[in-house]
Structures are given as C-alpha cells and as structure tokens.
Amino acid sequence: MESRSKPQFLAILTLFSVLFSQSLAWPLYGPPSSVRLDDRLQFEGAGDPDQVSLKADSDILQNALAENDTPYYDVSRNARHADGVFTSDYSRLLGQISAKKYLESLIGKRISSSISEDPVPVKRHSDAVFTDNYTRLRKQMAVKKYLNSILNGKRSSEGDSPDFLEELEK
C-alpha cells in the first residue's frame, strides 16, 4: 500500500505545483503591487549596479503589467468592425436587388418579344371581349328601360317599342 501512495503523492504534488505556479502567472490577479516589490530584504551589496538594474527592470515590469490591465478590445475597433459588417451586408443586398431587377427585365423582354411577334390575334381577342361585354351591357340597359316604362305605365303604343327593338339589335 505504501508503494502505491508514493506515486499518487508525487502526482498530486506535481499537479498542485503546476496549478500554483500557473495561478501566480495569471494576469487575473493583477500586477504585483509596489509594496511587495519594495519590501525585499536588502542584501549585503545593496548599492551594487546589479541592484539598480534589477530595480529598473522591476519598474519596466510594473509598467508593462499596468498597460496589460487595459481591455484587449478597443471601442473604436468594434465600431469599425460593425461598420464593415454593415457595409458588406448592405452591398450584398444591393447586389441581390440589382440581380433581381436584371432578371425581371430579361423575363419582361422575353414576354414582350413573344407578344410583339404576333400582336394582331391578341388585339383581336381583347377587342372581341370588349365588344361582347359592351353589347351585353347595352342589351341589359334596354331591357331595364323597357321594363321601367311598362311598370310606370308610360308606354305609348308607338314610342317605346321600336326603340327597344333597335337597342336590342345594336
């Protein structure tokens, strides 16, 4: 049992050391405070040039970490991205509309060209339909006028009957 616990203990120890070393390197915890950097133990050679360069390096590190605290994204960049997305979508929409209009114009030309090849039968048919409807309407009006004259008693022996026959024949 003791032989099994040593590898498990080593694995757990390795895991914790990795987690703790990574958690100290995360920027989520913020830059190291100046109090922690300045509270170092002074060694014998505190006035050495190495200590001065080390302090300068720590100042550079603090400035770099402070700059990294700013958000990664920029608001103006997001606005430009939104403008770009809108422009591309709008251009695509205009392209689709122009393609649709072009297609409709081609279809319209095809239909109009087939009509222009043989316009006489189409015109004859429409004229015949109009004439038929107009004749039917005039006959209905003549019948209505005749019935009104009969019902109102205004019928004369010679006046309305010849007109009625003439209107029915038209």
UniProtKB/Swiss-Prot annotation:
Domain of life, source organism: Eukaryota
Residue numbers bearing the Isoleucine amide modification: 107
Major subcellular site: secreted
Asparagine amide modified-residue sites: 152
Keywords: Amidation, Cleavage on pair of basic residues, Glycoprotein, Hormone, Phosphoprotein, Secreted, Signal
GO term, biological process aspect, one: positive regulation of endothelial cell proliferation
Subcellular location: Secreted
One Pfam entry name: Hormone_2
A GO molecular-function annotation: neuropeptide hormone activity
One of the record's GO cellular component terms: neuron projection
Phosphoserine carried by residues: 76
Coiled-coil blocks: none
InterPro entries the UniProt entry points to: Glucagon_GIP_secretin_VIP (IPR000532), VIP/GHRH-like (IPR046963)
Endpoints of the signal sequence: 1-21
Residue ranges annotated as propeptide in the record: 22-79, 156-170
Keyword Glycoprotein tagged: yes
Protein family per UniProt: Belongs to the glucagon family.
Reported function: PHM-27 and PHV-42 are two bioactive forms from proteolysis of the same precursor protein, that cause vasodilation. PHM-27 is a potent agonist of the calcitonin receptor CALCR, with similar efficacy as calcitonin.
Name of the protein in its database record: VIP peptides
Source organism: Rattus norvegicus
